[in-house]
């Protein structure tokens, strides 16, 4: 029997039923209001308590960099992120920043090689140094970094190697005023190369946090990717509060599927954004979903939803 049909002996609805029904109506009303707001033209960001950014790679199949920048401005976002330094002038033309810079490990993706593997250490050091220098020169404050793939390396050895590698580069980051943000990625999803990363060593939140704390620098922090954390560890809001001191950047996407932040996915993004505000997070939230329909409408919905 549904809770909403349970009645007390008097024949009246039970208190639990009334409260449950009221909560459901309130939640539905809030989501409906957000959905209505997202359909309106103009700026999607009204409150501005959550600073927002568009992650470029997700939309490069739909728009060039100038178009991505124009969409960011239209929605009220302050940044387009994970872009190569050659695109920094385009961002500046539109009055945008790059909330977090990328590392060029081409021809491989940047997460494929990291400090966990000594044979890549010099390559990672060089690429990370170049990224730090480029972002510092442009006035941008964050650079992404990764553990790398396991390739047979035990987790404890990989962590120790990461600590040693980050200790070699973090002093340069401190000197340049740049924060390295270590991203945790999920290793479970196997049906798409950018929805999951089987073999990635830093595939749990606490594993990455341990590395960060062992390095012991304020210029190495955690990139808290809500989508990846949900898949591997869950308990997203509790982990945000638990690791409040080391969160340097945040990414979004709907789960399952890494799609839009809509009713087809399981994460409550307004509640998660409120948790970020509660811990005093002052960084940027990057919208990093892979669009399955009109990309601008999906972005408008996501930005509106996170504008708590």
Regions inferred by a protein language model and the residue ranges of each:
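Histidine-acidic metal/acid-base catalytic patches
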Residues: 2-73, 81, 139-141, 192-193, ...
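Active-site acidic/histidine proton-transfer and metal-coordination neighborhood
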Residues: 23-29, 44-46, 113-221, 231
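Active-site mouth loops of central-metabolism enzymes
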Residues: 53-63, 111-123
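A short beta-strand-loop structural module common to alpha/beta enzyme folds
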Residues: 78-84
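Active-site-adjacent beta->alpha loops and helix N-cap segments on the catalytic face
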Residues: 88-90
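Anion (oxyanion) recognition and catalysis
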Residues: 73, 92, 136, 174, ...
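Feature marks short, surface-exposed loop/turn motifs that line or immediately flank catalytic pockets
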Residues: 60, 86, 104-109, 149-151, ...
């Amino acid at each position: 029997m549904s809770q909403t049909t349970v009645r007390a002996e008097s024949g009246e609805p039970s208190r639990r039923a009334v409260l449950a029904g009221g909560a459901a109506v309130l939640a539905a009303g809030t989501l409906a209001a957000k959905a209505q707001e997202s359909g309106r033209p103009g700026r999607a960001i009204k409150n501005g308590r959550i600073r927002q950014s568009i992650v470029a790679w997700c939309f490069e199949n739909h728009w060039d960099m100038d178009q991505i920048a124009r969409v960011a401005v239209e929605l009220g976002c302050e940044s387009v992120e994970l872009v190569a330094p050659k695109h920094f002038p385009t961002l500046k033309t539109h009055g945008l920043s790059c909330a977090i810079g990328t590392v060029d490990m081409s021809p491989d993706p940047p997460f494929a090689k990291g400090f966990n593997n000594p044979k890549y250490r010099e390559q990672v050091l060089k690429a990370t140094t170049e990224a730090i220098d480029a972002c510092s020169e442009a006035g941008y404050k964050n650079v992404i970094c990764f553990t790398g793939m396991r390739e047979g390396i035990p987790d404890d050895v990989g962590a120790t190697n990461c600590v040693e590698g980050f200790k070699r580069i973090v002093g340069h980051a401190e000197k340049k005023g740049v924060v390295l943000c270590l991203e945790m990625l999920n290793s479970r999803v196997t049906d798409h190369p950018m929805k999951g990363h089987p073999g990635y060593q830093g595939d749990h939140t606490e594993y990455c946090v341990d590395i960060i704390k062992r390095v012991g620098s304020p210029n190495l922090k955690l990139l808290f990717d809500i989508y990846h954390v949900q898949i591997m560890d869950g308990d997203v809001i509790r982990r945000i509060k638990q690791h409040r001191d080391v969160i340097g950047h945040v990414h979004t996407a709907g789960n399952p599927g890494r799609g839009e932040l809509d009713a087809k996915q399981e994460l409550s993004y307004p509640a998660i954004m409120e948790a970020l505000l509660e811990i005093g997070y002052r960084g940027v939230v990057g919208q990093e979903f892979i669009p399955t329909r009109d990309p601008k409408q999906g972005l408008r919905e996501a930005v509106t939803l996170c504008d708590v």
